[in-house]
Amino acid sequence: MADSPFPCVSVIVPVYNDPTGIRDTLTALTKQTYPTERVNILPIDNGSTDETRDVIRQFEREHENVTLVVEDEIQGSYAARNTGIEQATGEIFAFVDADMYMDESWLETAVDAMDEAAYVGCDIELVTNGEDTLPARFDAQTAFPIAQYIRQQQYAPTCGLLVSREVVDDVGPFDERLVSGGDSEFGSRVANAGYRQAFAPAATLYHPVRDSFSSLVKKELRVGRGLCQRQEYYADRFGRPGIPPRPSGVKSPDEESSGLDFERLLFGVLSVVMTGVRALGYYREYVRYVRGNTR
């Protein structure tokens, strides 16, 4: 996609109150085999109130291609990513989250895939951090079927996405109003504009599982809100608000799990509960939408 075998890449990493996560991610990013002079790493601090910014500054002092960027005005990952886009100098934007890590060849492998498409989703594997809890095992079963997302829903999650500057200049950045689902909304714009989307199975990123009930609930509430918001803002593409989210199916533990029958029962119950939590998030947002349209 460029004359140089190594196009300039801007790696954009939104972060909020996660010093450990951003340290792990920046450590992995600064060890990439991709030529250092062709990469600028942009951790975007989204108003952290802990030592997150201090951790980033330490990397900034030690690595000339790491630059701290601050987004204090709007709290939200899509606003942070858009600020990163504004500050980026690369021909390619690579998006990862601030609790992920990757092998040293990840960026080189991912950029190679850009020869075939202007929008590339990376492989994402969920990993445990030593906590063998029911929520961790449950979350691990969700996985990230990126190839299916791209083929059927025309998007890749922003925690593992590469996209050319040309595409963003054409279709616009992320919608900062969305609390979730901005990756889906952006991906549909890219597809509608006629750009090819591809999956890079060899470009693997590692994402920690959610290992507590509270983290699962927080995620599902946010996803439910995002479903309704996409319908509110983009009814032509996502339908009108008021249609509840459909259950994604009962998850089952893998065949290697001990106590399989009992665990399958627990997974089934938890699947139903989390679908209900997602619906709760959806209808909370729907009530806000209705009230806003009846004033």
UniProtKB/Swiss-Prot annotation:
Pathway: Cell surface structure biogenesis; S-layer biogenesis
GO cellular component annotations of the record: plasma membrane
Any GO BP annotation: S-layer organization
Keywords: Cell membrane, Glycosyltransferase, Membrane, Transferase, Transmembrane, Transmembrane helix
Membrane spanning stretches: 265-283
Source organism, top-level taxon: Archaea
Function per UniProt: Involved in the assembly of a N-linked pentasaccharide that decorates the S-layer glycoprotein and flagellins. Catalyzes the addition to the dolichol phosphate carrier of the hexuronic acid found at position 3 of the pentasaccharide.
Name by which UniProt lists this protein: Glycosyltransferase AglI
